[in-house]
């Protein structure tokens, strides 16, 4: 029997909603990246986009451990000389919480063309409302680790 190679048309995509309230940012990012890549599916192939759509709500209530809100810095550059802008993670979470969550999820993905295509299936919202109710998304539950 020959090896099964999935095609992009054979993949059925599901929609998941992740509530980011009091979830650690890195844990949220790894689970969302795995869903976007389709790592939990039996027909996963690293060269085919077989991931699901992920909706992250309540991005403004995500938990950042330790004192990273004051210590960690976010950088962006305008492209002009002297155009480096810096902002702490806490200030960035106040201004654009959805952008912080998107960047952390994008950082957990491989840095190639396929991941740039699968990141387009990520939808992040600061509040609890989202416009994708017609797709009937399932809620994604995090498994609790015994401490």
Swiss-Prot record:
GO biological process: negative regulation of translation; translation
Record-linked Pfam families: Ribosomal_L13 (PF00572)
GO molecular function, one term: mRNA binding
Any Gene Ontology CC annotation: cytosolic large ribosomal subunit
Keywords of this entry: Ribonucleoprotein, Ribosomal protein
Function according to Swiss-Prot or TrEMBL: This protein is one of the early assembly proteins of the 50S ribosomal subunit, although it is not seen to bind rRNA by itself. It is important during the early stages of 50S assembly.
Protein family membership: Belongs to the universal ribosomal protein uL13 family.
Subunit and partners: Part of the 50S ribosomal subunit.
Full protein name: Large ribosomal subunit protein uL13
UniProt lineage: Bacteria, Bacillati, Actinomycetota, Actinomycetes, Mycobacteriales
């Amino acid at each position: 029997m020959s090896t099964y190679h999935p095609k992009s048309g054979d993949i059925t995509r599901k929609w998941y909603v992740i509530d980011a309230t009091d979830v650690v940012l890195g844990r949220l990012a790894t689970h969302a990246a795995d869903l976007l890549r389709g790592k939990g599916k039996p027909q996963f192939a690293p060269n085919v986009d077989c991931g699901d759509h992920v909706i992250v709500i309540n991005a403004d209530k995500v938990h950042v451990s330790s004192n990273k809100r004051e210590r960690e810095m976010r950088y962006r550059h305008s492209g002009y000389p002297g155009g480096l802008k810096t902002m702490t993670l806490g200030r960035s979470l106040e201004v654009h919480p959805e952008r912080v969550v998107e960047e952390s999820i994008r950082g957990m993905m491989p840095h190639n063309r396929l991941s740039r295509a699968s990141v387009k299936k990520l939808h992040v919202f600061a509040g609890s409302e989202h416009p994708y109710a017609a797709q009937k998304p399932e809620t994604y539950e995090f498994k609790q680790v015994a401490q």
